[in-house]
């Protein structure tokens, strides 16, 4: 009901014409007022313990209004990667996704890759306790709004090889 009342086509067009290309208040409302961003996460992180079904329901509702909210990038892809990885980074970032304070942009596509997920030329070289990433990404949806970038980079293997690709969560500031 919230989306139907908030996201009529004319309002969507106005949001897209704003300098930031969206209304940040809607994302905050989805997370804080309605609590929807907590649905697919474990109770230990402040979630409701849902999963794929809850994500599918939400994606369907967002699709009905052609929403421009970063649900897929932040909750499904970013949150899913964090859930799978676990650990301190997940413990710190998932609650920020749930509260609406974190928006994740998934930086995976590269100009030469033509959406082949294994065609990654971006490299990650260990440097002390961290990594230095070097390369180019293209079409990173939600990047202008993101607090974090989830970047694919190669730590080993050749450019089109499936092995040797890792994901790095990087603060966007």
Regions found by a protein language model. Give the residues of each.
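Buried hydrophobic positions in well-ordered alpha/beta secondary-structure cores of metabolic enzymes
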Residues: 3, 35, 42, 58, ...
């Amino acid at each position: 009901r919230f989306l139907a009342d908030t996201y009529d086509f004319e309002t969507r067009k106005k949001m897209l014409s704003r300098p930031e290309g969206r209304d940040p208040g809607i994302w905050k409302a989805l997370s804080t007022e309605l609590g929807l961003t907590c649905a697919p996460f474990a109770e230990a992180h402040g979630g409701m313990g849902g999963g794929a079904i809850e994500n599918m329901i939400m994606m369907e509702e967002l699709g009905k209004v052609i929403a421009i909210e970063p649900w897929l990038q932040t909750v499904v892809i970013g949150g899913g990667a964090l859930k799978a990885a676990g650990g301190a980074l997940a413990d710190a970032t998932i609650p920020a996704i749930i509260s609406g304070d974190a928006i994740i942009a998934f930086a995976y596509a590269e100009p030469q890759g033509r959406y082949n997920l294994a065609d990654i030329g971006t490299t990650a070289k260990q440097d002390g306790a961290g990594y230095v990433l070097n390369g180019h990404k293209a079409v990173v949806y939600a990047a202008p709004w993101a607090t974090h970038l989830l970047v694919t980079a190669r730590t080993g293997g050749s450019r089109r090889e499936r092995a040797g690709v890792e994901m790095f969560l990087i603060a966007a500031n």
